[in-house]
Structures are given as C-alpha cells and as structure tokens.
Amino acid sequence: MMDELPSVSCSEEAGVRYLHLGDTPWVQGCMRVRKPYAVELDYVQRMLAWLLWHDVTDRAALQNLHTAQLGLGAASLTKFCLHSLGSTNTVVEINEQVIAVCHSWFALPQPDARHRVACMDAMHWVQAVENANT
C-alpha cells in the first residue's frame, strides 16, 4: 500500500455533497443528498455505458451480475448497482479514509453478501487468481 495517501474532505452546496482528496477543491465524486442512489456526475453516468449491452428490463439477469469497481470515489456507482440493478458488487479502494467517509457521509451500505469492500491496492486485487472471473 502507498505510504502517504491523501486526506479526505467533504463539502456541500445546493443540496449536493462532494468528496475531495487532499487540499484541493477538485471533486472526486458527489451525491445529491435527497437522491442518494442517483448518479449525479456526467462522467460517472458514462461509466455505466456497459449497461447498453444488457437487457435492463431483465431484473433476474441484472441480479446475477457481479460488478467489480476499482476505486470507490463517492460510492455513486456502487450504490447505483446495489439499489437500481440489484447486482452483487466488489469495490476495491486503497484509502481507508475514503471508505469511512463514504459510510458516514455518502450513504454507502455496510458490506453484506451482495456488497464487498476490499481495502487494498487495486493492482494486487486484479492480479489475484481468485478474482479472475469477477
């Protein structure tokens, strides 16, 4: 793991909560407080383009998906997959502060049978043989 990970901070404006890393105003992710499962940022919406290759009306098929997310951000993708798709999800995040802040401030659910959060370097997770079919 990296020796020095950036600090995590939050800001909020006009009903949108933002996640920042380090001492910068740059946004890593966000959540509309009144719609915590909605995907707010355009670039995060584009990350869901893979759904174009799936029949989104087939709920059973979506619930059989297992998504892997390398980096948590503000947990937008994770919450969307859990809430809207009902899929199983594995998230790999190197910064334990990001995980803690997402639980406290961004409505990230606690891990369960459908939702796993691994605090580790994503490179090591990808290289692990047991994750080959995820």
Question: What positions do the PLM features span?
Answer:
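Rossmann-like AdoMet
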Residues: 1-58, 82-84
